[in-house]
Amino acid sequence: MEDFVRQCFNPMIVELAEKAMKEYGEDPKIETNKFAAICTHLEVCFMYSDFHFIDERGESTIVESSDPNALLKHRFEIIEGRDRTMAWTVVNSICNTTGVEKPKFLPDLYDYKENRFIEIGVTRREVHTYYLEKANKIKSEKTHIHIFSFTGEEMATKADYTLDEESRARIKTRLYTIRQEMASRGLWDSFRQSERGEETIEERFEITGTMRRLADQSLPPNFSSLENFRAYVDGFEPNGCIEGKLSQMSKEVNARIEPFLKTTPRPLRLPDGPPCFQRSKFLLMDALKLSIEDPSHEGEGIPLYDAIKCMKTFFGWKEPNIVKPHEKGINPNYLLAWKQVLAELQDIENEEKIPKTKNMRKTSQLKWALGEKMAPEKVDFEDCKDVSDLRQYDSDEPQPRSLASWIQSEFNKACELTDSSWIELDEIGEDVAPIEHIASMRRNYFTAEVSHCRATEYIMKGVYINTALLNASCAAMDDFQLIPMISKCRTKEGRRKTNLYGFIIKGRSHLRNDTDVVNFVSMEFSLTDPRLEPHKWEKYCILEIGDMLLRTAIGQVSRPMFLYVRTNGTSKIKMKWGMEMRRCLLQSLQQIESMIEAESSVKEKDMTREFFENKSETWPIGESPKGMEEGSIGKVCRTLLAKSVFNSLYASPQLEGFSAESRKLLLVVQALRDNLEPGTFDLGGLYEAIEECLINDPWVLLNASWFNSFLTHALK
């Protein structure tokens, strides 16, 4: 076929077709039928315009031999065959000079006599099927469509064929000749069958045998065959009479399609109630680290050794007291638990050799905090299916909570830069293939933008805590093991640093199923005074445990140091995902890559370097009540990363539901912005599905409030 194309068509046409295919990443040597189709289409476009001129009186005329004295202007502007950028430039300039409406898709020709764009189609199938597909795709009254087939049939908008008989006959004869030539070489059948529908992604594979019979049996009334039904569906014009068409189809269907206009959508209703509270497994912006630089002590890298070394850097310990009690808990037990940790760490130091792990004594306060013997005994269903009053124990409906400002502050903080680097370059994974040169360049640029980001610190902290907790849960099932919360980073000068955020004590952990829960008590250092936003700390009991000297611009100031204590729980599956939080880096890198790809395809070259190094350019980050927020490419990287990290830290069924359902509304709104005139049915049901996920989760509530900002600005 490739040889045939090169013999049969003018070299200029062949060259243009090759260029067009390369632009879309296709290979003329492999996709030979497509190669032939593009050449045929180009030739028809050129023949359509050949010999047609407009004379000085503005009349259309046909001139076959060139008369050098005639003042003639080409009747048709050829758009097909130019590269995309040039083609759009031509279309724009035509629209500007003639006032014709700009088409959504690139047409093939412009007719200066009739003042309209023309879409030329060449099909190996039925002309009316192809015509319907074209019309359905371009959805424009203004663009004229003219379809030719290889069998000599043609079809045009309003049966207006634009050209005279003879010019059209020339085109039909040429198409017939191409068909004969292909047939004589045994190429026609494959070429005829290879035609895809207009821009429809799914392959039209043939349905045969039983499936075909079933398909024919299950057609709606009034359709004789599957082909007949397909043609009807392809030409389905959403122009207000959908309801009528639906009612023909089935007695069961009674959806009313409502047009979706700028005034249609309302904001999402966020719940009322007390403000939502912090529910992450560890503190985020409020965390405080005790750190050692360039650790070189004995046993460096063993968590317990590192933790003791970090504890020794602080000298301001004092007698702990409760500053914000937990509403429901036995607060003195939390206080006793912290005192026990201090005492047992002291005991370790008095021993000759520090052990690698530390199991806490099973005191009454720890048994209480870790819910020892509290959970109802789990019994195998087989052993109790005969029990008459078997039931699931009651659980309360969750209480609705309102959005609180702290979660937006948490998110803003997560996007900020810290003064340490939390990942090395290879954290995102190595190249697999040599072709990955561009990929590694992108990865390195991206890593440079996010390595100092606070969200990256949260990733490493999350990975560490979940790994340590899962290890201990498997290795010391019955023990109340003390697990230091540690992270490692590098300072600006490249010095290594080990940080201690606090401790976890894990409860009994006989985890048979993925969802079996292990309880733990977390105790985390902080300088945040809980009395500023008490609602955020509903689940915590907070102690004041020391005073810390801080260097500030005005000299040294002493600030109280707090310990945030709470009981919490997690499961094997949650810890497994927590250990894989580095995936967030990959997810946000891929989002950035798709932005670069989009730029590169417009500019027809790889834009990675310009993308990251052009510091003056700003990019859209997201909607806020103030409007569209913009920022540097680094800010975009960090914001995308923070979103991905928060999806992991605040993962919940509410988030799953909200993401899935709100996406549907988002797509409709985007269709409206793109002037695609969307229609909807049961919009109320969609709102209900979205709003039933807005209960009490801070991250979901924040996303819903962002969604409302987006709606406001999108529909202005």
Swiss-Prot record:
The keyword Nuclease applies. Mn(2+) 1 binds at H41, D108, E119, I120. Keywords: Cap snatching, Endonuclease, Eukaryotic host gene expression shutoff by virus, Eukaryotic host transcription shutoff by virus, Host cytoplasm, Host gene expression shutoff by virus, Host nucleus, Host-virus interaction, Hydrolase, Inhibition of host RNA polymerase II by virus, Manganese, Metal-binding, Nuclease, Phosphoprotein. It is an enzyme of class 3 (hydrolase). One of its GO terms (cellular component) is host cell nucleus. InterPro entries: INFV_PA, PA/PA-X, PA/PA-X_sf. It holds the Pfam family Flu_PA. Phosphorylated on serines and threonines by host kinases, including human casein kinase II. A motif (Nuclear localization signal 1 (NLS1)) lies at residues 124-139. Belongs to the influenza viruses PA family. This is Polymerase acidic protein. It comes from Influenza A virus (strain A/Chicken/Hong Kong/715.5/2001 H5N1 genotype E). The gene is PA.
